[in-house]
Amino acid sequence: MNHRGSIPELTPARRAASSFVLSAGFSLTGAATVMLGVLLPVLSQRWTLSDETAGLLLFLQFLGSALGAVCTGLHRVRSLIIGYGLLALSMSAIAFSTARAPFAAFLFYGLGLGMAMTATSLLITDRSGDESAAKLEALNFIWSVGATAGPMLFLPFLHRADVRSLFLVLLCLFLLLLAWVALAERQAPRRTQTHDARTARTGTARALLPLVILAMCAVGVEAAMSGWLTTYSHRAGLRSLAGAALATSLFWFGEMLSRLAFSTRLLAQIGRRATLHATICGVLVSLVALVSVPSPSAILVVAAIAGICIGPLYPLLLSFMLEHSARGWIFAVGGVGAAIFPWLTGALSSHFHSLRFGLMAPCAAGLIMALLQTIAAWRDHVAAPAAPIPSR
């Protein structure tokens, strides 16, 4: 029986409607996250941006996203309202900008994305109880659907060079989601942690640090690929924007497929650690191939393979990190990498006058991940008890 002041339970119909709308909004944030990377060739021409300045736009968006994850409070619905409100305001500023790039608007755009995505994830987790892991896997897949479909859905606006209409469509969708959250959503009761669980998590900072670095690098690679693949493909010989955007779509399609595959029993059969080792190796190999063979057809193939390899990586690392802490900063650490590596890619590209050299930044992130995994495997081998020597 609910005591006075407790939060009323949602009816099954309301819960289903809420899950549907929140999932649709989460998928929209997937498309909105990759939007800047897909539009970057057009926006660079419109606002006369160098690669370094274009990288700064990506940096501001993902920095805002990381800050949004940190700023997401315990009241998930209020954070959702603020997030979608910021998205609507920043999108209107971007839509009506003229000769100069609205740098501040992209920072607040990322802030809104970070708050909306993190609050949705935590609200679904609060409502799911013991099924929270499965729900998070489903949410990651839904987000990937939006990220995959986004580049193709943006193409009609790119063909007409009418990006303002795209921004206005997104503005209307964000306003609809804002209205739903403000009028229909209710805060869910949070699961409490026992003192023993908090104490156990406090003592695992040493185990958490490598996971944090891995998450920063994994999301940094994902953001750099998403942000620069269209531009890289365009310069490598895919002259039409449709063909260039196809590389980004193939990357997200590969990621979506792998997340779908690993949301089944496949992950349990292979094992989390074995999957982690294999995907990190695959990411590094595909990144090296991307800069080694910059032909249009090779880029399309490698983009799909890179997406397949990187797809399960962040959800897998997130599952390891959530065993130690379930706070919003866990979602923010990936955003730090997502802010740094796309910007660093643009800065290196401007310095060396070659985007191939710029893509050494995500290659370095892949190398860091491989080295960390090698060290972890060596430590596990050393810590393992020696097998008994059989007597003659």
Question: In which residue ranges do the predicted regions lie?
Answer:
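Interfacial helix-cap and linker-helix signal at transmembrane-aqueous boundaries
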Residues: 43-44, 75-76, 153-161, 233-234, ...
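A late C-terminal transmembrane helix in Major Facilitator Superfamily
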Residues: 324-355, 361-362
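Intracellular juxtamembrane helix-capping segments at the cytosolic ends
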Residues: 115-128, 311-324
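C-terminal transmembrane helical hairpin of 12-TM major facilitator-type secondary transporters
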Residues: 273-317
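Conserved MFS/SLC helix-loop-helix module at the cytosolic interface between two early adjacent transmembrane helices
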Residues: 66-98
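Helix-to-loop junctions at the C-terminal end of transmembrane segments
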Residues: 66-78, 158, 258-271
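Symmetry-related core transmembrane helices of the 12-TM Major Facilitator Superfamily/SLC fold
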Residues: 165-183, 359-375
